[in-house]
Structure formats: C-alpha cells, structure tokens
Swiss-Prot record:
Keywords: Ribonucleoprotein, Ribosomal protein. It comes from Mesoplasma florum (strain ATCC 33453 / NBRC 100688 / NCTC 11704 / L1). The gene is rpsJ. This is Small ribosomal subunit protein uS10. SUPFAM superfamilies: Ribosomal protein S10. One of its GO terms (molecular function) is tRNA binding. Pfam families: Ribosomal_S10 (PF00338).
Length: 102
C-alpha cells in the first residue's frame, strides 16, 4: 500500500513567524501519532521595486525597495482523520499563508 502524504506549504514575509508556525504544526501533528518530514526551506522570492526619488527631473536619482517571500514545506506521512481535525484547529499568526495538498 502506498503511503499518503499531506504537504503543507507556508509563505510569509517574516521568516521567524513562519518558523514558529511550523513548530506549532509539527507539535500538533506528532501529538496524533503522525510522522513529520521537514521543515524543508524553499527558495526565497525577491521582488525589487525601483522608483524615482524626484517627481519631475533627476532621473539618475532612484531608490530601490525589495520584498522577500520566505517559503517552507512540511510533509506529514500517513495522516489520520484526527490529524486533519487537529491541524484545522491550530491557531497561526497573521502574515502566514498556508497551502495544504493531499
């Protein structure tokens, strides 16, 4: 019989909040007896935005801002229905985007 995998992908702008969320999810999943693989750090997306400092002239004077999106992957092997119920009830901070695939 092939083992089932639940993949949880977390995204956010602050890596510390993502790591705290991962620890909460691991603690909840291991409490139900499921095996957890990860956290696996995924590549960070970096978006750079360049704007002109002056409104009318001085095109050579520019300012750059960047926005980094940190990502982590967590795999739960052979999740039970109780594991899924517990994961639905985990309270996570705002600023963390979660994708769950079975």
């Amino acid at each position: 019989m092939a083992e089932q995998k639940m993949r949880i992908k977390l995204k956010g702008y602050d890596h510390a909040i993502i790591d705290q969320s991962i620890l909460k999810i691991i603690e909840a999943a291991e409490g139900t007896g499921a095996k957890v693989r990860g956290p696996i750090p995924l590549p960070t997306d970096k978006q750079v935005i360049t704007i002109l400092r002056a409104v009318h002239k001085y095109k050579d004077s520019r300012e750059q801002f960047e926005m980094r999106t940190h990502k982590r992957l967590l795999e739960i092997l052979n999740p039970t229905p109780t594991t899924m119920d517990v994961l639905k009830r985990v309270q996570l901070p705002s600023g963390v985007d979660i994708e769950i695939k079975l």
